[in-house]
């Protein structure tokens, strides 16, 4: 069987609301940490989300 190339990650809001998304990414093609703009429903606006490890 092939080794899984995708890693589960957590995207944490930088607005300080505690909101997060979970997703997965291909660790071979994108080894750097993700920084993406997404909607934070607690802040009610688009903010940056940083990748952190999923525990």
Swiss-Prot record:
Matching InterPro entries: Ribosomal_bL33 (IPR001705), Ribosomal_bL33_sf (IPR038584), Ribosomal_zn-bd (IPR011332)
GO biological process, one term: translation
Basic and acidic residues composition bias: residue spans: 1-10
A GO cellular component entry from the record: cytosolic large ribosomal subunit
Region: Disordered, residue numbers: 1-27
Any GO MF annotation of the entry: structural constituent of ribosome
Pfam families the record matches: Ribosomal_L33
Keywords: Ribonucleoprotein, Ribosomal protein
HAMAP family in the record: Ribosomal_bL33
Family, per entry: Belongs to the bacterial ribosomal protein bL33 family.
Protein name as catalogued: Large ribosomal subunit protein bL33
Organism expressing this protein natively: Polaromonas naphthalenivorans (strain CJ2)
Gene this protein is translated from: rpmG
